[in-house]
Amino acid sequence: MPISRNSIVGAALAFGLLAAAGSAQTLAPEVQAKVQAKAKQLSSWSTDPVIVEAVKAHNANPPAEYRDMTQEKWKALSVLDPSVRAFSKNPLGQHLKAKQDGQITECFVSAADGTKVAFLAKTTFWSHKDKDKHKVPMAGKVYIGPAQLDDSTGLLEVQVGLPVLDGAKPIGSIVIGLGVSKL
């Protein structure tokens, strides 16, 4: 059976996408513009009262059952573990789910210390405090990361990090993954 030109082109594109997905990559200008526009649209989440109040409550009184959580313990937990599911089933997790659109592949809200307050699905890491996706928003700025294959979703995505603001003060971060193929 002869191999068609379309098969070769399709295979080359798939290989190129997979090779590029293995590491961070630069987005085409038109995709960058779409990411910027989506980040601007999502910026209202920074002052969403449900998000702000949940982060303030968590910062004031972190749940005792998570005070000893480590990255290693977190990675060992199943997505079905009740302590993991609590983050997607809590009121903020449900609020995030209601806000999700077809372009959002993941979303998590972190407290000032980088630990989780809520998410759509289990994150790869328990704390992102040392990552730019949390540090930049905690400085009151928007973070837009490179396109990369996300470990938790398995999709090529760009992460947008926004500050959670109490007035003008950053008190936490929101990281929203945008599927590159969905933009």
What kind of region is each of these model predictions?
Residues 10-19:
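Bacterial N-terminal signal peptides
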Residues 27-124:
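Extracytoplasmic/periplasmic sensory segments of membrane signal-transduction proteins
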Residues 119-173:
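Extracytoplasmic/periplasmic ligand-binding sensor regions of membrane-associated signaling proteins
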Residues 22-25:
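Boundary of Sec targeting at the N-terminus
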Residues 1-11:
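Bacterial N-terminal signal peptides that target proteins for export
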Residues 13-14, 104, 173:
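Extracellular structured ligand-interaction cores
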Residues 176-183:
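Helix-start (N-cap) segments at beta->loop->alpha junctions
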